[in-house]
């Protein structure tokens, strides 16, 4: 099939009213990626060299989204909702370019995979004009049935039109199909709208092709792969299926997940062998983790790069631009954003590091803050190799701490510190003997007087 050209036509024009959302249905996300983008990825993995996405509701928002996740895809607008065949013909310009295979798919089936699509394409390569993808749901009620005879598909029958015998068929229509490019437009143009709704149904091409003496067959996908999303409950179901698959894939690739069901991956998470992930960890888009890292419980990571043998968390937050080098440590209740933590450096607890570099082997004490924002602009903090920053320090950017520099605890550092220098940035402590007792007695007396006055008012 590698020699056969292929176009995917992805139908994504529906309003999706059951989602009860201002966002077009197919832009709701699975693993941080719009549903329709998952469909495009599957089509491309199955050999589609071009993608035509048919849009309607929220067209401008859809165009912007498509540009982000698939710049090469084209969008075509279905101006009126006149049925699925009518929607496919909105992409007539693309279909007419002479592709060998046309994959017709739906933007709300995010779990479809290349294997199911390639099986349908294989049937076209073997001579079929149409290959319809079917599935076997636990309960077929409500689905159109695939009616076969002698190994050929002769009709797709909506349940309300099924005979009693046809209602017993468990093989149902998933809505997706592969159509030979040489026949596609002729078959689509032959679809009529003489039905109760006055719409043009894609399923009619099965009988039209059969009447023209063309071969029509059915292939089978799993129930999960064919799952269509119509509401938030089904969206959550699909998310669960996707996550379960990705967790299994990670574990079989050498990643240890202590409590797999509590770890959530993004569509693009990369994670190396011998990494250990503790319970309740969330990975957002753009995370790359090399082998041997340890991610402790309740960490939240997005847009971050974590090198080999790093240690993260528990309760750590790594935001976009966080770059942890080999054996770096970011501990509990720390946030790192747009910052490099170099080899062996330690940011152990209760710390914010933003727009900064922490040099190799440096140690950042508890409660340290890089003050990087003045309300208008961001500024950079550079902490040199082997530097030590004492607890509860504020580093007011732009500022640099030289190699081996030492910052005393509780300092507010507003000027750069040279290599190997010691810097204090705090008021000198003053101790007044007996003053503590005096204050305590004064405060106790004032509190008692206030309580007495309050009682008198009642």
From Swiss-Prot:
InterPro entries: Bifunctional_GlmU, GlmU-like, GlmU_C_LbH, Hexapep, MobA-like_NTP_Trfase, Nucleotide-diphossugar_trans, Trimer_LpxA-like_sf
Residue numbers binding acetyl-CoA: 366, 372-373, 391, 409, 426
Listed EC numbers: 2.7.7.23, 2.3.1.157
GO biological process, one term: lipid A biosynthetic process
Cofactor note: Binds 1 Mg(2+) ion per subunit.
Residues noted as binding UDP-N-acetyl-alpha-D-glucosamine in the record, renumbered to the chain: 11-14, 25, 78, 83-84, 144, 158, 173, 230, 319, 337, 352, 363
Species of origin: Mesorhizobium japonicum (strain LMG 29417 / CECT 9101 / MAFF 303099) (Mesorhizobium loti (strain MAFF 303099))
Annotated region (Pyrophosphorylase), positions in chain: 1-232
Keywords of this entry: Acyltransferase, Cell shape, Cell wall biogenesis/degradation, Cytoplasm, Magnesium, Metal-binding, Multifunctional enzyme, Nucleotidyltransferase, Peptidoglycan synthesis, Repeat, Transferase
Enzyme kind, highest EC tier: transferase
Location(s) in or outside the cell: Cytoplasm
Region (Linker) location: 233-253
Subunit structure: Homotrimer.
Protein origin, superkingdom: Bacteria
SUPFAM superfamilies according to UniProt: Nucleotide-diphospho-sugar transferases (SSF53448), Trimeric LpxA-like enzymes (SSF51161)
Residues at the catalytic site: 349 (proton acceptor)
Family that this chain belongs to: In the N-terminal section; belongs to the N-acetylglucosamine-1-phosphate uridyltransferase family.
Cofactor: Mg(2+)
Swiss-Prot/TrEMBL catalytic activity: alpha-D-glucosamine 1-phosphate + acetyl-CoA = N-acetyl-alpha-D-glucosamine 1-phosphate + CoA + H(+); N-acetyl-alpha-D-glucosamine 1-phosphate + UTP + H(+) = UDP-N-acetyl-alpha-D-glucosamine + diphosphate
Name recorded for this polypeptide: Bifunctional protein GlmU
Signal peptide residue numbers: none
């Amino acid at each position: 099939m590698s020699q056969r050209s292929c176009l995917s036509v992805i139908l994504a024009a529906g309003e999706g009213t059951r989602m009860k959302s201002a966002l077009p249905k197919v832009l709701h996300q699975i693993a941080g990626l719009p549903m329709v983008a998952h469909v495009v990825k599957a089509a491309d993995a199955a050999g589609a060299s071009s993608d035509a996405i048919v849009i309607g509701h929220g067209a401008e928002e859809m165009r912007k989204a498509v540009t982000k996740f698939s710049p090469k895809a084209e969008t075509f607008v279905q101006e009126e909702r006149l049925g699925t065949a009518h929607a496919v013909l909105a992409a007539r310009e693309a279909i007419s370019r002479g592709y060998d295979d046309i994959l017709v798919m739906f933007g709300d089936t995010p779990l479809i995979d290349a294997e199911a699509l390639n099986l349908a394409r294989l049937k076209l390569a073997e001579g079929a004009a149409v290959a319809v993808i079917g599935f076997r749901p636990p309960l077929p009620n409500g689905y159109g049935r695939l009616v076969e005879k002698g190994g050929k598909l002769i009709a797709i029958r909506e349940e309300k039109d099924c005979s009693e015998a046809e209602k017993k068929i468990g093989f149902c229509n998933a809505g997706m199909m592969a159509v030979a490019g040489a026949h596609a437009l002729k078959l689509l143009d032959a679809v009529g709208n003489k039905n109760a709704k006055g719409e043009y149904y894609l399923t009619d091409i099965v009988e039209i092709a059969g009447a023209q003496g063309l071969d029509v067959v059915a292939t089978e996908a799993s129930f999960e792969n064919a799952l269509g999303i119509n509401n938030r409950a089904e969206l959550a179901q699909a998310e669960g299926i996707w996550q379960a698959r990705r967790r299994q894939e990670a574990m079989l690739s050498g990643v240890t997940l202590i409590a797999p069901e509590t770890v959530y991956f993004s569509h693009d998470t990369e994670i190396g062998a011998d990494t250990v992930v503790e319970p309740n960890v969330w990975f957002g888009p753009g995370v790359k983790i090399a082998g041997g890292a340890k991610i402790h419980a309740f960490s939240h990571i997005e847009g971050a790069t974590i090198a080999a043998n790093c240690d993260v968390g528990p309760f750590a937050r790594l935001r976009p631009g966080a770059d942890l080098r080999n054996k770096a440590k970011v501990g509990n209740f720390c946030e790192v954003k747009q910052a490099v933590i170099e080899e062996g450096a330690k940011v152990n607890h209760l710390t914010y590091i933003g727009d900064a570099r922490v040099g190799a082997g440096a140690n950042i004490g508890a409660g340290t803050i890089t003050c990087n924002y003045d309300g208008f602009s961001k500024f950079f903090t550079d902490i040199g190799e082997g530097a030590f920053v004492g607890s509860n320090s504020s580093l007011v950017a732009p500022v640099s701490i030289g190699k081996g520099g030492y910052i005393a605890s509780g300092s507010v550092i507003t000027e750069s510190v040279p290599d190997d220098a010691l810097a204090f940035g705090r008021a000198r402590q003053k101790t007044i003997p007996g003053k503590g007792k005096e204050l305590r007695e004064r405060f106790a007396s004032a509190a008692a007087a206030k309580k007495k006055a309050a009682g008198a008012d009642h």
